[in-house]
Regions:
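Hydrophobic anchor at the start of a short beta-strand
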Residues: 154-156, 218, 252
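Ferredoxin-type iron-sulfur electron-transfer modules and their immediate structural context
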Residues: 1-124, 220-375, 379-396
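Accessory recognition modules or surfaces
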Residues: 117-131, 165-177
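Residue-level marker for well-ordered alpha-helical positions
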Residues: 143, 180-184, 205, 350, ...
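Short secondary-structure transition/capping segments
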Residues: 169-171, 209-211, 395
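Beta1-alpha1 glycine-rich phosphate/pyrophosphate-binding loop at the start
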Residues: 14, 18-22, 26, 52-63, ...
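Short, contiguous strand/loop micro-motifs
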Residues: 32, 44-45, 132-133, 140, ...
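Feature captures the FAD/FMN-dependent oxidoreductase FAD-binding
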Residues: 69, 127, 132, 183-228
Length: 396
């Protein structure tokens, strides 16, 4: 046996062949029969949200960019987060996968914390184009419908007989909802969507014919308060939960029995119905049937066994024994946000990059796969703790 040689510097190295080139020329991707693809899936919390809230997205935005960006993400699907953060029965939380490890994320409290941000412009609004729409009734359905039409570029006027917007929300007790919070939430969404708000229109019932002739579409909100509901515009009633399209330009939104009479705890349902109604109207006005689809595509759910804890993350804290009105501090919100597993949503954790043996993955505003060198081993999909990466058969 030859004695061990101590190598202290480069000069001590024995003579050997050495290449200073790279292996980029060797496109090992031709060996691949499975191809990695990355696409966000629908997590259990979002699939159980009547308003279709992008829950992991807004929590990731809160952690990375702060409450203003998080609120911007929230308001893409929910124009009244301060109300859902206080009134909603939060069906999202019982579905949280984290509950199997310790306790579910307190999503409602995070939403409430984010809603307290002073934000006027939340996201880009489409340029106002053709289409003049009237929404009769400033209840939660009418406001939500008007908001989503407004941010999609339609000119929308909301009319109500009351002196204050809110409709059935005005009847919610002060103990459950501070009137200032309600007013601030409505003012913010009206400003963001560029809505025209005409209140105190006590003669709406008598003016229906004039309104019909002045607007392309007229929507009647069943959650508003006023006499106009008793004198519909003689259209076919429209149920956004079961109808596939709008067949008339004068519609009265109908509600399922479980939402009658108005129930504050079901606020997310009313917002979701307003959103669906706006989608159908957009499809009619833009002659694009694809726009009339639901709020979220329920066919792409994340597989439960694809989501797992990597390092445990922050453990569940003891339930906060605070009054209903007490707000969370930034520290409390961040601690709770860090517990989110981001199920089905890539948060650029870098796990796939770390384990890829071919160094074929990069992160640039999302995942990029170098398919010239990826061999399709599937390690990235196995190691992804969010269930985002899937392996598909390579097409010939």
């Amino acid at each position: 046996m030859q004695p061990k040689k101590s190598i202290k510097c480069l000069a001590d190295m024995p003579v050997m062949p050495l290449t200073i080139g790279t292996m980029e020329w060797n496109q090992t991707g031709t060996w691949r029969y499975l191809t990695p693809t990355a696409s966000n899936k629908i997590p259990p919390c979002r699939s159980n949200c009547p308003a279709g809230m992008p829950i992991p997205d807004f929590i990731n935005a809160l952690k990375a960019k702060g409450d203003a960006q998080a609120l911007s993400v929230v308001m893409r699907q929910n124009p009244l987060p301060g109300l859902t953060g206080r009134l909603c029965y939060h069906p999202c939380q019982p579905k949280c996968i984290r509950r199997e490890h310790d306790s579910p994320i307190q999503i409602q409290r995070l939403e409430r914390y984010v809603s307290n941000c002073d934000l006027i412009e939340s996201h880009a609004i489409a340029e106002k184009g053709t289409g003049n729409i009237a929404v009769i009734g400033a209840g939660p359905i009418g406001l939500a419908c008007a908001y989503f039409l407004g941010v999609n570029g339609f000119e929308v006027t909301v009319m109500d007989a009351g002196q204050e917007a809110g409709g059935a929300l005005l009847k919610v007790s002060v103990e459950k909802l501070d009137p200032k919070v309600r007013a601030d939430e409505i003012d913010r969404m009206v400003a963001i969507a560029g809505l025209n708000l005409n209140l105190g229109q006590t003669d709406l019932a008598a003016s229906l014919t004039i309104i019909e002739n002045s607007y392309d579409i007229v929507v009647v909100d069943p959650t508003s308060v006023g006499h106009v509901q008793q004198k519909p515009l003689n259209p076919d009633n429209f149920d956004p939960l079961s109808s596939t399209s709008i067949v008339t330009k004068k519609i009265v939104v109908t509600l399922p029995e479980k939402l009658i009479p108005f129930k504050p705890g079901m606020i997310a349902h009313y917002i979701g119905i307003g959103h669906l109604t706006a989608n159908h109207i957009s499809a009619l006005m833009k002659k694009d049937p694809a726009l009339s689809c639901g709020i979220i595509d329920l066919s792409e759910h994340v597989a439960k066994d694809c989501v797992r804890l990597v390092d445990g993350g922050p453990a569940a804290s003891a339930p906060l024994k605070v009054s209903r009105e007490k707000e969370w501090s930034e520290e409390q919100a961040m601690v709770e946000a860090e517990r989110c597993l981001s199920c089905g949503t890539c948060n650029e954790c870098g796990q796939c990059v770390q384990y890829c043996p071919e160094v074929s993955i990069q992160i640039h505003d999302g995942l990029e796969f170098d398919l010239f060198h990826c061999k399709g081993c599937g390690i990235c999909a196995y190691e992804c703790p969010r269930g985002v990466i899937m392996m598909e058969e390579a097409k010939a």
